[in-house]
A protein has these predicted regions:
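Terminal substrate-recognition subdomain of acyl/acetyltransferases
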Residues: 87, 102-126
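Active-site-proximal loop/turn and secondary-structure-junction residues that shape catalytic pockets
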Residues: 40, 76-78
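Short glycine-rich hinge loops at helix-strand junctions in the catalytic core
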Residues: 49, 66, 89
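Acetyl-CoA-dependent GNAT
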Residues: 1-46, 55-57, 61, 65, ...
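Conserved catalytic-core motifs of GNAT/GCN5-like acyltransferases
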Residues: 73-75, 86-108
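Short glycine/proline-centered loop/turn elements that form peptide/ligand docking sites
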Residues: 51, 55, 78-81, 98-104
Length: 126
């Protein structure tokens, strides 16, 4: 059986240098959902809209298949990541996981979802 998990390196087109990786699960937790396990970009490329471009191109690719949604989880204490995911269209909270009470060594994640057909191309440049 083909694995649902894929780890993809992210490279700059012109330089072919690795700037990060993308960790995805096809059809998890449901057949019509693509789960983004991780997206990591090197700090040297922050602020150049590579994250937005990666998500936009990923959506273009997965629209060719039967996916309707993408999901990811984000730590509640990670404000830059929450802002990023909201900006690229992960605006629906579909769940949460983690510790039940707050503390320094405690964690909690929001599970966010995007309807991949809800965003228009022109919205990506806002």
């Amino acid at each position: 059986k083909k694995s649902l998990h894929r780890l993809q390196t992210i490279r700059l087109k012109n330089e072919n240098s690795v700037i990060g990786y993308l960790d995805i699960y096809h059809g998890w937790p449901k057949k019509n959902i693509l789960w983004l396990g991780d997206i990591f970009l090197h700090s040297k490329v922050y602020g150049h809209n590579y994250g937005r471009e990666i998500i936009y191109n990923l959506i273009k690719e997965i629209k060719k298949f039967e996916y309707k949604y993408m999901r990811c989880s984000v730590r509640l204490k990670n404000w830059p990541a929450i802002r990023f995911w909201a900006r690229v269209g992960f605006s629906k909270v579909v769940g949460y996981l983690g510790d039940k009470d707050y503390g320094v060594n405690k964690f909690a994640d929001l599970i966010l979802e995007m309807d991949i057909n809800a965003r228009r191309k022109e919205e990506w440049m806002e």
